Structure formats: C-alpha cells, structure tokens
C-alpha cells in the first residue's frame, strides 16, 4: 500500500513490520520562497518570486505556491513570469540565509539518523532502516522529521521506500507537506503507471527515444528487452530497467564517513563516436559544466585540469595542465580542456569517451558567494557576470534537473549521448 497524508493520519496497517531498507527523501517545499515568506510575514499567502529582474532578462529560481497558481514555474524567464503574475512580489534571493536554514534542516536529519546524503540545498536522502541505527518504525521517524522541519517555519515533502529511486519519486507525488509511503512489496504498483520522466535521470532525449519504441511508462520500461533499451542506454540498460521496476539497491553513507576528495571529474560514453571538432568541444564543455557545479556544491576549486579521451579502437589518452590559480569556473577550466584537445586528438579520429577532471584543490580567488544573484570577491568588488550566472544555474539544475537550463553548445548533440551520467555505472561522475 502507498499513501500520502498532509495530517499524517495514516492507516494502522502501514505500521506493520517493515522488511528491508527504509530510504527517505526530504524535499523542502518552494524552499527559497518559503524562507522569504518566513522572513517577511506580510508576504505570506501572496505570490512571491525569487529570481532575476524582469527588466534585465532574468530567470525565475523558484516561486511560492501562490505564484504557481498563475502558471509561474522555475527556470521561466522573469519577463514571462511578470506577465503571468503582475502582482507578484519579487526578490533577488539571499543565498546565505537559505544556506543557514538548510543547515538547520540538515541538522534535524543528522539528529534522527547518521546516514544522510545531502543532494542539494533543499533535498537530502536519509536511511532509517530498522536495526541499522535504531528499531523505531520508519514511518514514525519520517513523521517526526516532517514535524520538526515545520517547527522551523518551512515545510517539506517526504517520500519513503526501499531505495532512492522510489523515495525520490514518492516525495514529488503530494507537494506541499506530503508524506508518501511506498511500503515494501508495493513498488511495482506505485511505479508502473507513471510516465518515464518521473524517474530522475531520464531527460527529454531519452524520453523521445523511448517513445519511438513504444515505451511511455515506467511499467513498460521495467519490462522492455535489451534489444530496445541497449541502443538508448548502452551498458546501463539493465540498471535503468531495475530502477524502473523498483529493484535498485541504494546506499546512504554515514555523515561522518571519510570524504577526502582529491579530484572531481565526469566522463561520458557516446552512443555514436564523435569526429567533428565542434561536437567534441561541445561535449567537453558539457562535461565541464557538470564538474563546475559539483565543485561549487562542495566548496572546492582546483589548479589542475585533466582531459581524457578514449578512441573507438580502444586506446585512451590523458593530458593535464596546471593553472596559475585554483578555479571552480567551467568557463575557465573548460576552455583549458578544449585547448588541450589538439595535443591528444587529430580531427577525424573517432572518440568513444571523453572526460574532464579538476584536482589539486586550493583557495578560489573569487571568494565565496554571498547572494544568489550577486557574488562578491575577497576585495568586495562584484565578481564576474559569468560566475554569478553559474551559481544561479546551479540552483536551478539542482532543484529541477540538468534539462532545466542548457546552452546551445550543450544541446547540439545531446540526443547522441548515452543519457545523463546518473545512469552511467562504468563511466559515472566521480569525486575521488
């Protein structure tokens, strides 16, 4: 049975024995806008939009549920949002405040279980499996987490199931203030009727490719043959199928587990070999965007840039360059990676895999970001517009996925990529 209740008046049978892992996903509801309404009581019950100015071609980072009634959505242009909801209250956002509130929420999770995996500023997985840390029923713990978060003045939605895929999808079924429980053994019935895009990692390109072979629901995806899935997902076809069937095996590490990261990298295997210089450079920049976002999320910046290529005939080449200063800006290290290309590749050679990495971490001369749309360097001067934009895009992509915003260079060959790196097992993003 799966259920979802705002008041948590849950059916007694749900509290029977829970067999196997219990993985939760806590997602803060309209987080940035909720914090703004908390800090400005006069804004409560009114449409609030957090984002760039409509007069300066800004974008919406997030908005309150009152604004969503008018059709306003994250990643929408601010100009369009203003047309849809002219009475909305606009704010550029205050990222330091959001981080402060996020830390308080994450502390609640850490108090309930040592097994917490923070996904983004407003989202985290947690493991409350019976017997792993305590013997209390997982549903009771999830209820208490929701209530404790609400006591801070913001709300969350929680999905609870036996793995991360189920928990993530469940958390999105009944927002805001939802608690959706997928009890052990009911995963197939919960997932099967849902569209394939409900599963994280399936973007527009994969959705279109699946539709062309008649696969539109997770139930159909779970039963599809290798012959249908391998051309779309390559070596990851079986992993995708298991996730769609609710059979994924998930791990949530302890908060204090070793995290001595020496490098951050991302690799992709291409569905079709790349031979055109423009396509190769676009692929390198796409990989760099992912690495840059993960560097900023961890508060890291590196001096050494690594470019890795693997050719269709099996041979691979790797080359590095050291920078004068550490950076987390993909526009900087991505350009360096593209510049390194000529040293290990000749036009016409078939590239099967490409990877970009950053290591040798040190202080970033740009300093830390103090406002969602306004970054300040160590001398108090305004940082570059590109860095400001990168931080904003990070927030959008963290919350709504990599498809939320993309540059033309990233989409020119997107349909030829094995679907997003979340599906890659042999060649996944790495923090090592």
In which residue ranges do the predicted regions lie?
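DNA-contacting surface of Y-family translesion DNA polymerases
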Residues: 10-17, 198, 206-351, 363, ...
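Short, charged/polar surface micro-motifs in flexible loops or helix N-caps
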Residues: 31, 54-57, 312-316, 361-364
């Amino acid at each position: 049975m799966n259920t979802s209740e705002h008041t948590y008046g849950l059916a007694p049978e749900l509290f029977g024995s829970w067999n196997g892992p219990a993985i939760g996903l806590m997602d803060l509801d309209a987080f940035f806008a909720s914090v703004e309404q908390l800090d400005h009581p006069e804004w409560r019950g009114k449409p609030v939009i957090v984002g760039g100015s409509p007069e300066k071609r800004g974008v919406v980072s997030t908005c309150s549920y009152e604004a969503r009634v008018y059709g306003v959505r994250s990643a929408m242009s601010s100009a369009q949002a203003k047309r849809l909801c002219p009475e909305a209250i606009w704010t550029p956002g205050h990222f330091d405040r959001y981080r402060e509130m996020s830390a308080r929420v994450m502390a609640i999770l850490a108090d309930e279980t040592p097994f917490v995996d923070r996904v983004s500023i407003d989202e985290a997985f947690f493991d409350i499996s019976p017997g792993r840390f305590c013997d209390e029923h997982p549903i009771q713990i999830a209820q208490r987490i929701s209530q404790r978060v609400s006591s801070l003045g913001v709300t969350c939605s929680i999905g609870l199931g036996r793995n991360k895929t189920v928990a993530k999808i469940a958390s999105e079924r009944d927002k805001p203030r939802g608690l959706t429980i997928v009890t052990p053994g009911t995963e197939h019935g919960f997932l099967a009727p849902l569209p394939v895009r409900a599963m994280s990692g399936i973007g527009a390109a994969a959705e279109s490719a699946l539709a062309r072979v008649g696969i539109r629901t997770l139930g159909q995806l779970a039963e599809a043959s290798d012959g249908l899935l391998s051309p779309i997902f390559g070596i990851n076809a079986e992993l995708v199928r298991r996730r769609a069937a609710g059979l994924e095996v998930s791990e949530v590490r302890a908060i204090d587990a070793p995290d001595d990261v020496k490098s951050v990298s991302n690799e992709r295997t291409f569905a079709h070999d790349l031979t055109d210089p423009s396509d190769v450079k676009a692929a390198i920049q796409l990989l760099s965007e992912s690495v840059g976002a993960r560097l900023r999320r961890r508060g890291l910046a590196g001096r050494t840039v690594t470019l890795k290529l693997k050719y269709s005939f099996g041979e691979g080449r790797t080359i590095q360059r050291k920078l004068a200063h550490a950076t987390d800006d993909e526009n900087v290290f991505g350009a360096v990676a593209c510049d390194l290309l000529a040293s290990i590749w000749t036009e016409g050679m078939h590239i099967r895999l490409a990877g970009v990495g950053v290591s040798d971490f040190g202080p970033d001369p740009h300093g830390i970001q103090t406002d969602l749309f306004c970054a300040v360097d160590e001398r108090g001067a305004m940082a570059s517009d590109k860095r400001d934009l990168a931080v904003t895009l990070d927030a959008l992509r963290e919350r709504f996925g990599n498809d939320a915003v993309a540059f033309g260079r990233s989409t020119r060959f997107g349909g030829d990529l094995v679907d997003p790196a979340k599906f890659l097992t042999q060649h996944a993003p790495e923090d090592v």
